[in-house]
Amino acid sequence: MIDCLSNPSWINPQIDFLLLLQNIRIGHFDILDKFFLSITIFGEFWLPTLVCAITYWCIDFNAGLYLFSLAGLNSLITHFFKMLACVYRPWILSDKIHPSELAVPFAKGYSFPSGHSAMSSSVLGGTAYLLKHKKTICISLICLILLIGFSRLWLGVHTPQDVLCGLSIGLILIFAVNIIINWADKHPNRYLYLALAVNIFATLALIYINKFNEYRIDYINGELLVNPEKSIYITTVVYGYVLGLLNGCFLCRKFFPFNPKEIDVKSRILIGIAGGLIIAFGLKYIIAYIIMNKVKFSIAIPIMLTSGLFITLIYPIIFKYFDKVFKKNAK
């Protein structure tokens, strides 16, 4: 195990802070582990996807597009940074750190930056930005973001620098994506340029992490601490899913724009429930199965890409078509 003293000097105070939380957690408040583990779920990708999708399908198309752009770009950036930095988890940096046993199975791969912190600050922060005139909701969302970040520290699966960087990525994206979307809205063709730019970035990023990036290969008792090949695989298939989401959003905005408010309330509720069930009990487990079983790329990438496209392009086209048919028959 790599000792804390062998790490850069700025890591030591962070380890000390985690040890302080650990002493509190193990000594008196270990029962809070389950609470913080439930809180941290809000930073996982599938739940923000559900929030974005319900907004996109049923409430406000433009707001949903903004949130999906935040979630997608956040995922592309954080996964790329994780592969570049190759920072180990706290319990690898110091054998004094003992993370919550409940959280370890969900904290695989590299540590920096915190994906949960970045995702929550992007999507929940973006939601707060959209609802900035409703102070109570904004304050509640900001508190939830901070609580998610703190939960990663409490559980011992991230250092403060991981969390702070993740929160910063989300904060920067909130304003950057708003500027980009406002620019694209001035001419619909610009959404095609956005799609092209995202695809180019993702392609170059994947080429770099697959062919040129250098990875640490460290063993403890003959066991590889972090398997770079597995991390590369996960990043690649996640990129496929995210590209499906983003390309679907941009193509839908260009060629199939719709206003959920033009659909009657009952239909919107049915659309949200049906789509939500597909995400929660379908796509979520398909994606998990692909990653856990390391399905070969020739099968995994098309499935992941189609899954993303289904949420942001195919499903809206389907329910928009049937809405027109029902309205026509009603006349």
Model-found features: residue ranges?
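Membrane-embedded catalytic cores of phosphoryl/pyrophosphoryl-handling enzymes
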Residues: 51-52, 56-58, 75, 91-285
